[in-house]
């Protein structure tokens, strides 16, 4: 009898925590990511440099860097600092998975699956939260998961761009929207943390997705404020939200501070407006939609959602407008409106000249990564109103029927996209990662278009402006990168004295750690070390047990330059550590995280104590 009671209690807990639904979500995830486990990737430029970023993180950790930023092995030993410019969080997770499973292809596959599975759980709970007063809220949540998983957005993230940063960023988008809703429903610390970690995770994952999401977050915030309609309560919520966003900045400061430092420095290509214009980042001429998705079926296998689903969303928008007085219809209206705006963004009629600031994301299709989320939410939020006049039992079976139908149709279209859109581009991951041309140390694709190289590298044969004009004329986005690679191959890997009065000997290099002997005359002189310059290098000499810091800066050729004092003879040491901005950022991130953890533990302890007293 006691065993039966325990089994019954276990079954109740199983249902209470939605485990049966999570198993279905896991099955849906496996269906969407199965091609990866056959060892297939779309091995385009995005995958190449994201693979390189993971390798760089591991290389930087092996170099002894506490915050892995500079990869001393990249570019045949000249080094590259992906993680100072590009959200490093995906590389951390993939590196940990690789350490456990020992396989590159499996580590990427598991990462994609985990992102999609957790996103599914978030969407399920977010939808259920919005429909908490409805009987079939969990079934609708499951339908939202299926719609999202088999949407063009998931296809774009996983199989078109094949960029692991985007599915992780989308996970944080869902967490952020869910947290905002919880905060306006009830001012709780849980909602505070959801907004904080959601907002922090976005830039740490993918800057482009962050920029694409920002206008929709602001519009949704305005919607929630208007819907609340209570000025006093809104002020309190906005105050809490401001503190939450401040915490998000603190949590991500270890990345944001050095990023801003580099962008303001004017040293790198990415901070040059002419470079950005030439490569489409602030050039409206590059940023135009196309009509083809409306009448050429092959385009649907790439970026555009199916026309059938676009018409469904249009119907949802109209029906939500008609039933606007109902709460669910209000939510459905805003999400269907967002979805239709995302569709319009892909067409030439969208007035991008009014929103030219967003050209930094390079392509209107970048916004499409949000369509699956918004369209799925818009549909499941309007269904309870559509089924309102049907009896409970009939409504239940009809909801299951819709779940099955949309899942089958969605999966069929998703599979079709993969077969016709990406399968011809698939390459066997394991063999690809072992090929010499794909080696991240030498392969040019591993640094994308060279946007994070110093401007002087790649423009030695002619002035920078002329070089940029030529690449703009030729529409060659890889021109600067290729020219830089050519220069690096000619440069050689030995240090060079920048004055005749300095003698260099006993040069050795291991990772970013460099040691050499220098002798100067009556005047100080500088040495150029064959390492691409990024803020964070330190140089010093020793007097007994005391370290004497030396000045390190960028050389005229874009490398590390160390100033050696006059009348000096001895050993000089150099390695990549942390810039001032990184140090302050790390300190702030640690303080923020520890503070939030202490508050969480304290609140949990007090809550448990109060429940025991009752």
Curated annotation (Swiss-Prot):
Pfam families: PTPS_related. It comes from the Bacteria. This is Uncharacterized protein llmg_1573. The lineage of its organism: Bacteria, Bacillati, Bacillota, Bacilli, Lactobacillales.
């Amino acid at each position: 009898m006691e065993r039966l009671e325990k089994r019954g209690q276990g079954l109740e807990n199983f249902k209470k925590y939605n485990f049966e639904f999570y198993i279905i979500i896991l099955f849906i995830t496996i269906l969407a990511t199965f091609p990866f486990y056959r060892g297939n990737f779309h091995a385009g430029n995005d995958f190449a440099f994201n693979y390189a970023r993971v390798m760089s993180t591991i290389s930087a950790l092996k170099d002894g860097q506490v915050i892995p930023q500079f990869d001393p092995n990249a570019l045949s030993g000249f080094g590259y600092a992906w993680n100072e410019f590009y959200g490093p969080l995906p590389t951390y997770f993939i590196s940990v998975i690789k350490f456990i499973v020992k396989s590159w292809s499996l580590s990427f596959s598991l990462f994609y699956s985990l992102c999609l599975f957790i996103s599914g759980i978030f969407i399920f709970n977010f939808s259920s939260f919005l429909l908490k007063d409805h009987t079939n809220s969990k079934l609708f949540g499951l339908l939202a998961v299926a719609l999202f998983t088999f949407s063009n957005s998931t296809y774009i993230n996983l199989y078109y761009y094949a960029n692991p940063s985007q599915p992780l960023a989308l996970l944080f988008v869902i967490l952020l929207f869910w947290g905002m809703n919880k905060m306006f429903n009830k001012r709780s610390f849980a909602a505070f943390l959801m907004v904080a970690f959601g907002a922090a995770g976005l830039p740490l994952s993918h800057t482009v997705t962050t920029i694409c999401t920002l206008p929709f977050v602001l519009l949704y915030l305005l919607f929630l404020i208007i819907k609340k309609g209570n000025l006093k309560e809104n002020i309190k919520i906005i105050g809490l939200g401001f503190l939450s966003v401040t915490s998000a900045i603190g949590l991500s400061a270890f990345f944001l501070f050095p990023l801003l430092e580099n962008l303001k420095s004017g040293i790198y290509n990415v901070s040059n407006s002419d470079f950005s214009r030439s490569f489409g980042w602030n050039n409206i001429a590059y940023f135009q939609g196309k009509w083809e998705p409306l009448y050429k079926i092959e385009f649907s296998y790439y970026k555009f959602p199916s026309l059938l689903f676009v018409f469904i969303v249009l119907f949802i928008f109209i029906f939500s407008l008609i039933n606007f007085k109902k709460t669910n219809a209000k939510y459905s209206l805003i999400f269907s409106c967002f979805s239709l705006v995302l569709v319009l963004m892909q067409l030439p009629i969208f007035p991008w000249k009014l929103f030219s600031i967003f050209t930094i994301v390079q392509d209107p299709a970048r916004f499409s990564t949000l369509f699956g989320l918004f369209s799925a939410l818009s549909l499941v939020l309007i269904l309870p109103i559509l089924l309102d006049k049907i009896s409970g039992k009939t409504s239940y079976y009809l909801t299951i029927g819709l779940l099955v139908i949309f899942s089958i149709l969605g999966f069929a279209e998703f599979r079709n996209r993969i077969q016709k859109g990406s399968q011809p581009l698939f390459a066997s991951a394991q063999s690809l990662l072992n090929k010499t041309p794909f080696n991240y140390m030498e392969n040019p694709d591993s640094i994308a278009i060279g946007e994070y190289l110093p401007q002087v590298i790649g423009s030695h044969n002619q002035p920078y402006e002329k070089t940029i004009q030529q690449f703009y004329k030729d529409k060659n986005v890889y021109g600067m990168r290729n020219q830089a690679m050519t220069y690096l191959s000619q440069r050689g890997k030995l240090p060079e004295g920048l004055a005749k009065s300095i003698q260099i000997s006993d040069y050795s290099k291991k990772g970013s750690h460099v040691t050499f002997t220098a002798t100067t005359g009556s005047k100080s002189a500088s040495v150029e070390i064959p390492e691409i310059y990024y803020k964070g290098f330190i140089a010093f000499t020793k007097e007994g047990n005391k370290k004497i810091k030396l000045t390190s800066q960028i050389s005229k050729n874009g490398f590390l330059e160390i100033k050696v004092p006059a009348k000096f003879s001895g050993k000089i040491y150099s390695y990549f550590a942390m810039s001032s901005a990184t140090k302050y950022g790390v300190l702030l991130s640690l303080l923020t995280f520890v503070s939030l953890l202490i508050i969480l533990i304290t609140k949990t302890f007090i809550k448990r104590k109060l429940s025991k007293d009752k």
